[in-house]
C-alpha cells in the first residue's frame, strides 16, 4: 500500500512524516491514523456550510489532504471537519477552485457511487417526465434531464432534444468511462433515444483540467449509423438542433416556459402588435411572439444563429404552426449599437424582449454587467409605446434579483417611464433551484408593463 502523502493545503507543501489526526466514520481521532486511502480535512466555515445543506468546498477551505503518493488523485475523497469527524464523501477536482463537491453524507466506495449515479439519474429523468414530457406531450418533446448539483449529480448535465440525448461530464470526478456507461444505460432504458452524444463545455473542462472527450457518439457505437441533428418541439413550435453547433448543449431549454409566458402576455397586452426580440439566438422568443403579433424582428450578433432561426421559421410556416401574414425579420447586429440607433431614430414597438448572454461570469464582473443591463433596458424603454410590454432577462447568477430590478428602475428613471412589475419568473422546472445551494438559481426574468 502506498504511503500517505499529507499535503498542507494552505502552505502548499507535502509533509510525509506528520501524522494525520482524523476520525474515520465517527471513531475517535488517533495520532497516526490515516485517511484511508485518501481524504480531506476542511475548515470550520466550510463544515458549517455543508451542514446547512451546501455541497461545495473551495480549495482555500481545505486545511489538509492525505493522498496516495502513486497514481492520479482519486475521484472520490472522504471529507472530515476540522475536528476530524467524517462528514461524507466528495468528488475531488484538484485543478478547480471548487475542489470538493459532496455527493454523500457517508463513506462511499466507487462501486456504491456508480450505483448512486444510476439511482439519482433515473429519479431525475422520471421527475422531468412527470413535470414536462407527459403533461406537454404533443407540444414539447425536449427538456433538461439532469441539472448537475440540483439533481445531486455534480458535473453531470443532460438534455433531451426529441430523439437525441446530449450529455456533458464537466468535473474530474464524473469524467470517466464508468460514469459514461451508467448514463448511457439509463438513457437507453428510460428514453429509447436514436443517439446519445457527449458535447462538452470547453471553458468548464479547461477549469477542471480536463481534456476534450472523444467526438464519437456514446451510442450507437457506429458513428456512420448515428444521427447528430434533429427537429424538436417546444410549446407546439418546431426547432432545429445540430450537435455539431450551438451554444451550451444546443438550445436554451431553460427559457421554454418563459417563451410560452411571453406569448401569453403579448396576446393580452399587445395583440397584433410590433415585437422585438433582442439577442434572439435561434428565434426562441421571436417565433412564439410571431403567433400573436403582426410583425417580429429578431436581433443577434451571430449570423450562424440567425441562419438557424430562419430555418426554424421556415419549418413552422411549412407545418402551419405560423401564419404567412406575420412578417418576421432577422438582423445581424450588435444589440447595444442598434438599440442606441433605433431609440435615437424614434422606433416604436409594442413588445420588446431582452435576453442577453451572461454579462457577469464572476463577482468581479457584476459592476460592468449592471451597466450593460441598464443600457439595454434604457434603450428598450425609450422605444416602447405607452402600455407596452417589456420582458427583460438575466442569466448571470452573480447578478441578483434586487440588482437587476435596480438596473431596470434606474433605466426607467432616465427614460422618464413608469414600469409596473407583472411577474418575476425563473428557469423552467427542468432546471430546479435548490434553496440550500443558491448557485443553482441563475435565470431571472421580469415581465413589465411600461407607461
Regions found by a protein language model. Name each.
Residues 112, 118-141, 166-216:
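Cysteine-centered catalytic environments shared across enzyme families
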Residues 1-162:
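Non-catalytic accessory regions of SAM-dependent methyltransferases
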Residues 162-171, 388-395:
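Short glycine-rich, basic-tinged beta-strand/loop micro-motifs
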Residues 87, 166, 238-239:
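Short, isolated positions in well-ordered beta-strands
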Residues 146-159, 179-252:
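Non-catalytic substrate-recognition/targeting regions of SAM-dependent transferases
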Residues 220-451:
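Rossmann-like S-adenosyl-L-methionine
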Residues 58, 165, 270-274:
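Mobile, glycine- and charge-enriched loop segments
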Amino acid at each position: 500500500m502506498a504511503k500517505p502523502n499529507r499535503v498542507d493545503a494552505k502552505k502548499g507543501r507535502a509533509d510525509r512524516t506528520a501524522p494525520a489526526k482524523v476520525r474515520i466514520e465517527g471513531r475517535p481521532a488517533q495520532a497516526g491514523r490515516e485517511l484511508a486511502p485518501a481524504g480531506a480535512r476542511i475548515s470550520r466555515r466550510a463544515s458549517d456550510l455543508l451542514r446547512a445543506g451546501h455541497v461545495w468546498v473551495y480549495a482555500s477551505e481545505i486545511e489538509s489532504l492525505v493522498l496516495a503518493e502513486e497514481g492520479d488523485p482519486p475521484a472520490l475523497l472522504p471529507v472530515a471537519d476540522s475536528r476530524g469527524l467524517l462528514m461524507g464523501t466528495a468528488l475531488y477536482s484538484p485543478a478547480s477552485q471548487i475542489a470538493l463537491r459532496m455527493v454523500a453524507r457517508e463513506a462511499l466506495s466507487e462501486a456504491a457511487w456508480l450505483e448512486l449515479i444510476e439511482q439519482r439519474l433515473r429519479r431525475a429523468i422520471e421527475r422531468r417526465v412527470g413535470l414536462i414530457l407527459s403533461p406537454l406531450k404533443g407540444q414539447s418533446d425536449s427538456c433538461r434531464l439532469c441539472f448537475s448539483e440540483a439533481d445531486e449529480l455534480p458535473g453531470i448535465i443532460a438534455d433531451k432534444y426529441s430523439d437525441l440525448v446530449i450529455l456533458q461530464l464537466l468535473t474530474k470526478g464524473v469524467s470517466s468511462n464508468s460514469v459514461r456507461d451508467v448514463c448511457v444505460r439509463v438513457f437507453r432504458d428510460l428514453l429509447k433515444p436514436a443517439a446519445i452524444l457527449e458535447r462538452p463545455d470547453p471553458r468548464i473542462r479547461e477549469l477542471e483540467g480536463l481534456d476534450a472527450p472523444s467526438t464519437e457518439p456514446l451510442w450507437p457505437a457506429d458513428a456512420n449509423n448515428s444521427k447528430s441533428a434533429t427537429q424538436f418541439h417546444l410549446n407546439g413550435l418546431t426547432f432545429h438542433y445540430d450537435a455539431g453547433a450551438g451554444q451550451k448543449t444546443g438550445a436554451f431549454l431553460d427559457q421554454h416556459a418563459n417563451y410560452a409566458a411571453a406569448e401569453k402576455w403579448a396576446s393580452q397586452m399587445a395583440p397584433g402588435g410590433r415585437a422585438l426580440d433582442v439577442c434572439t439566438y435561434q428565434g426562441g422568443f421571436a417565433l412564439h411572439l410571431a403567433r400573436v403579433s403582426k410583425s417580429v424582428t429578431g436581433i443577434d450578433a451571430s449570423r450562424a444563429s440567425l441562419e438557424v432561426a430562419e430555418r426554424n421559421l421556415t419549418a413552422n410556416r411549412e407545418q402551419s404552426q405560423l401564419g404567412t401574414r406575420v412578417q418576421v425579420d432577422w438582423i445581424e447586429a450588435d444589440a447595444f449599437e442598434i438599440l442606441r440607433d433605433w431609440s435615437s431614430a424614434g422606433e416604436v414597438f409594442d413588445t420588446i424582449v431582452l435576453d442577453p448572454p451572461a454579462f457577469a461570469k464572476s463577482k468581479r464582473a457584476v459592476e460592468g454587467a449592471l451597466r450593460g443591463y441598464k443600457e439595454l433596458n434604457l434603450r428598450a424603454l425609450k422605444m416602447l409605446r405607452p402600455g407596452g410590454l417589456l420582458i427583460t432577462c438575466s442569466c448571470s447568477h452573480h447578478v441578483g434579483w434586487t440588482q437587476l430590478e435596480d438596473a431596470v428602475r434606474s433605466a426607467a428613471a432616465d427614460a422618464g417611464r413608469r414600469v409596473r412589475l407583472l411577474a418575476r419568473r425563473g428557469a423552467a422546472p427542468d432546471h430546479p433551484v435548490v434553496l440550500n445551494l443558491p448557485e443553482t438559481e441563475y435565470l431571472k426574468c421580469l415581465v413589465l408593463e411600461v407607461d
